[in-house]
């Protein structure tokens, strides 16, 4: 069956017989792998549309469980990203991060447009690139349904002041729930030494440095509203650490 879709190239892999496998984030079908015989070194529109950091339109032959790219046209090439090392490294990281989050064959139009917004901003931005990446990641979590809960306690569900931010629990804890957890943990550790609890303890943070407000701001506002925002380096590093954990 012949079909077409807009898409963003995540990466490409060379295979045998001068063919390549393109990992494509398509608007219509989500993340798909599609083979193609279009030559990489060509200067035609189809060849240019198969490179990473490219937003294009792709004509596909869709089999029951596979895709082949017959032709492609560039809608927009973010070639300027590749001319700056910092932009390129951050852009490549975002493509890899997005690839890990996406499920195979599941359309994700919200994330698709979010990624395009990110590239538009990255191409024109000269400072605070790390802040832009963090904003993208936090909003991506929201679209994927795994964003941390920051408007109410993850245990009791009440809108109380944040006392701790817990990665294992997935959001903020009020003081009452935190103290209950501590008491329960103390009783458990009196019976047996538990290294798992000790390791989880290192994934709980005080919210004093503004993490809750930052997460709320990034979640509520569009990515384009972050274009002039740049976090302090230590705050950015801590947020990146939280995301990776």
Model features per residue range: what roles?
Residues 1-21, 25-245:
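Non-catalytic alpha-helical scaffolds and adjoining flexible linkers that form interface surfaces
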């Amino acid at each position: 069956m012949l079909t077409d879709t807009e898409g963003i190239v995540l990466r490409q892999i060379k295979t045998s017989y001068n063919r390549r496998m393109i990992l494509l984030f398509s608007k219509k079908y989500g993340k798909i792998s599609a083979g193609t015989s279009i030559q990489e070194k060509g200067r035609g529109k189809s060849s240019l549309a198969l490179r990473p950091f490219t937003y294009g339109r792709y004509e596909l032959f869709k089999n029951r469980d596979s895709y082949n790219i017959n032709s492609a046209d560039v809608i927009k090439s973010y070639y300027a990203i590749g001319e700056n090392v910092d932009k390129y490294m951050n852009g490549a990281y975002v493509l890899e991060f997005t690839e890990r989050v996406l499920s195979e064959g599941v359309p994700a139009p919200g994330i698709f447009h979010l990624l395009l917004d990110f590239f538009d901003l990255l191409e024109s931005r000269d400072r605070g690139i790390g802040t832009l990446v963090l904003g993208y990641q936090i909003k991506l979590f929201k679209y994927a349904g795994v964003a941390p809960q920051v408007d109410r306690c993850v245990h009791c569900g009440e809108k109380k002041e944040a006392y701790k931010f817990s990665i294992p629990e997935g959001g903020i804890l009020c003081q009452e729930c935190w103290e209950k957890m501590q008491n329960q943990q103390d009783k458990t550790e009196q019976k047996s030494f538990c290294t798992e609890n000790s390791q989880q303890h290192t994934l709980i943070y005080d919210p004093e440095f503004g993490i809750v407000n930052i997460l709320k701001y990034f979640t509520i506002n569009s990515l384009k509203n972050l274009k002039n925002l740049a976090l302090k380096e230590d705050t950015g590093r801590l947020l990146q650490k939280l995301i990776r954990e």
